[in-house]
């Protein structure tokens, strides 16, 4: 296990595979504000930037920004890749050259898998990974609308568009974030077999 700032990356070695698990990379915003009841829906980091709107894809300059300033959600930041959390993930991906990425969020029991900027090969792998997740969890597959993904600036968009790395984003939990802790056991039971089967798929087994 290595420690990087306030985050930890766990290196789990089993035969020819290694899984790097990165805990929440935008935790200081919520932790600093949860004591204020009005801010319990805070999604952005402490700078008021939505990390999932901050990745430097080709579409970032044209991405609509309804907030236009630091706030609790959706603000894309003053520049692409401006935030330390974004930079951390970019550096990690560039250094490790992952074969695939499984990205977990909380809210909705759905799986985001497609991207109109992904190559046919990456898109096919995205779909295969999504089918594996759905088989374990029963979550619904969702393809972002064309207008919504045209100028995508999230982690998934960056992986598909700029890096060509197969990936899916899995939204766990019922209701809106923060998902109640009472759901942890059911979420775990639904998802516990996902990672092993994703690894088998990537290895072609």
What are these model-predicted stretches?
Residues 1-115, 169-179:
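Active-site/substrate-binding loop(s) of hydrolase catalytic cores
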Residues 46, 136, 162-164:
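Short, well-ordered coil/turn elements that cap or connect secondary structure elements
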Residues 54, 58, 114, 132, ...:
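Surface-exposed loop/turn and secondary-structure junction residues enriched for glycine/proline
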Residues 60-61, 142, 204:
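Intrinsically disordered or highly flexible coil/loop and linker segments, enriched in small
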Residues 89, 95, 100-103, 108-123, ...:
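Active-site-adjacent mobile loop/cap segments within catalytic or ligand-binding domains
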Residues 101-104, 138-145:
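Active-site neighborhood of phospho(di)ester-bond hydrolases with catalytic His/Asp-centered motifs
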Residues 118-137:
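Gly/Ser/Thr-rich active-site loops/lids in small-molecule metabolic enzymes
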């Amino acid at each position: 296990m290595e420690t990087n700032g306030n985050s930890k990356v766990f290196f789990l070695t089993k035969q020819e595979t290694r899984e790097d698990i990165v805990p929440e990379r935008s935790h200081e915003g919520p932790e600093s504000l949860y004591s204020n009841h009005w801010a319990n829906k805070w999604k952005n980091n402490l700078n008021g930037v939505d990390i999932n709107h901050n990745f430097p894809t080709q579409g970032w300059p044209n991405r609509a920004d309804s907030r236009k300033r630091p706030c609790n959600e959706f603000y894309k930041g003053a520049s692409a890749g401006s935030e330390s959390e974004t930079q951390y993930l970019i550096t990690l991906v560039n250094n490790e050259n992952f074969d695939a990425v499984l990205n977990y969020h909380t809210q909705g029991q759905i799986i985001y898998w497609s991207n109109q900027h992904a190559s046919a090969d990456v898109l096919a792998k995205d779909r295969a990974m999504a089918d594996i997740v759905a088989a374990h969890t029963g979550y619904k597959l969702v393809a972002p609308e064309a207008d919504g993904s045209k100028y995508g600036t999230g982690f998934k968009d960056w992986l598909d568009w700029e890096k060509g790395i197969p990936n899916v984003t899995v939204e766990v939990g019922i209701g809106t974030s923060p998902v109640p802790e009472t759901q942890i056991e059911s979420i775990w039971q639904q998802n516990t077999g996902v990672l092993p089967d994703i690894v088998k798929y990537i290895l072609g087994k």
